[in-house]
UniProtKB/Swiss-Prot annotation:
Domain of life: Eukaryota
Membrane topology category: Multi-pass membrane protein
GO cellular component: membrane; plasma membrane
Residues bearing PTM Phosphoserine: S265, S269
Record's protein name: Sodium-dependent phosphate transporter 1
Catalytically driven reaction(s): 2 Na(+)(out) + phosphate(out) = 2 Na(+)(in) + phosphate(in)
Transmembrane parts of this sequence: 21-41, 62-82, 100-120, 158-178, 203-223, 230-250, 511-531, 558-578, 600-620, 650-670
Organism from which the protein derives: Homo sapiens (Human)
GO BP annotations listed: biomineral tissue development; cell population proliferation; monoatomic ion transport; phosphate ion transmembrane transport; phosphate-containing compound metabolic process; positive regulation of canonical NF-kappaB signal transduction
Gene name of the encoded protein: SLC20A1
Amino acid sequence: MATLITSTTAATAASGPLVDYLWMLILGFIIAFVLAFSVGANDVANSFGTAVGSGVVTLKQACILASIFETVGSVLLGAKVSETIRKGLIDVEMYNSTQGLLMAGSVSAMFGSAVWQLVASFLKLPISGTHCIVGATIGFSLVAKGQEGVKWSELIKIVMSWFVSPLLSGIMSGILFFLVRAFILHKADPVPNGLRALPVFYACTVGINLFSIMYTGAPLLGFDKLPLWGTILISVGCAVFCALIVWFFVCPRMKRKIEREIKCSPSESPLMEKKNSLKEDHEETKLSVGDIENKHPVSEVGPATVPLQAVVEERTVSFKLGDLEEAPERERLPSVDLKEETSIDSTVNGAVQLPNGNLVQFSQAVSNQINSSGHYQYHTVHKDSGLYKELLHKLHLAKVGDCMGDSGDKPLRRNNSYTSYTMAICGMPLDSFRAKEGEQKGEEMEKLTWPNADSKKRIRMDSYTSYCNAVSDLHSASEIDMSVKAEMGLGDRKGSNGSLEEWYDQDKPEVSLLFQFLQILTACFGSFAHGGNDVSNAIGPLVALYLVYDTGDVSSKVATPIWLLLYGGVGICVGLWVWGRRVIQTMGKDLTPITPSSGFSIELASALTVVIASNIGLPISTTHCKVGSVVSVGWLRSKKAVDWRLFRNIFMAWFVTVPISGVISAAIMAIFRYVILRM
């Protein structure tokens, strides 16, 4: 009893002078929310960037799922890492007689980290939130107490983890993807093995997640009181239960869905629906390209030389299926200048007459584009190509715009891979698109548009745009000497960065369906781990600020309050909804092409690495883990599938973030110490 009275008196005496620092506490809460906002805007792409980029979920769905799992993860897993950020980097005992200086340092650290992360988010540059807060914490400590205030041994461990985390995550992702590819993807019929593996994948995901929560993730909820055998038993039991649910309910439903997709042949698919508007006996009047070349000059092909009884084909999307490297050059669909070589039938709305005698019915929007520009292209899409796989699960679901946009009214987005990707598929002319948008965002459009005829400088593009640049070539009227130009051959593609080698190892449509929900699950797992690890970046200094003000003890043993973790989780969610789209577009596409199977391997292995690090109290970067996994899996698929220039820039940013945030924090701390507090 005497000890309790003594400690209470000491706390009261210590907290008395700190009432004067209430303004600093309020300022700290405001800056902490801004910091959490910046964390959500920048780092959330690590969790759902690949899922949104591959079209598995829309941006709105990703925001909803991430809001739930980020918040839950921040509450259940965030306390452990907050302790490391709060007391592991600096010697807080040196601030026993200068609590106000430690509070000012916490505000300075949050300010320095928030400013740099907001700038990086505005520039769509993915950086590490952990790097920011570590550098900012060291920056204010150097100003306040000099080199003696920093635990350099702990800093060395953290710096080592920055290199170890992408390496470990990359190795784990590579091993997992190698097993998936060997036992599922490379099988003649991957569906049986994939269905057998589903319960295992779900069980591992759920079991690991529950174990991380109960082992050390949520001490305030009482999970830390469970014995080790109890934690293992509960985790294994829940994992087995989940596996049974998946085996008896999910697998049969998935099998039926895949069978329906397989039975639906490509020609019967709504994606390439073809309707014959005339009777079958009129099909004999169709002319082949070879007949036209032999009997008539191509430039004279028109309504006068082609019978009007030709079959009118209505295609939702203008492309043809072909087998990889099997279609002879003469059978490839030509690139046509509609102003010179074809005629638009006035009797049929939007019907275009091709050199082979067929009339192709286009939608009103496409017809307007044809009439205004006169350019429209057909492309052969090979069944084994990555473009074909992407078509099946994007265009077939009619959500190309929804994947990265808000509604179907705006299916084409400027300055991202979907714009060039969709326009290349549909053969839409880029000239009109450039004319409308080039004046406003000329610099951004350089990443999107093809080079002009007079310029031979190759413009760097992302992987999707490079691939479309390889399979399509927009010709102007002055460049066309002949009426029909054959599509680029495979030999011409091999010399470009958009080589088909990047797309050789692609998921089959049924495999994509198999892994789509798994990728969503692993994205949720990654979001949960991200919330547990990165909420400490925003709340760690705020916890130190609040506990010093509340208890007057710089080395308080009080556990991190749950409501503070929840406060940080809410800030992360707000940042995700407002600015999350910017970095998601960068991380979800540009580093390497992602398929559902590779995305599953990337997300599960990187999330497992982050969760393990969170439970041992080591603040690692989720950005590093995800980048390491993406590069590892992309390198296994094809060395050319990785944008090594972008990887180099990201790697350089890892070193720049720490000193920049540290300098900003040190400057603010100097103002506090020498101008405001005069301590």
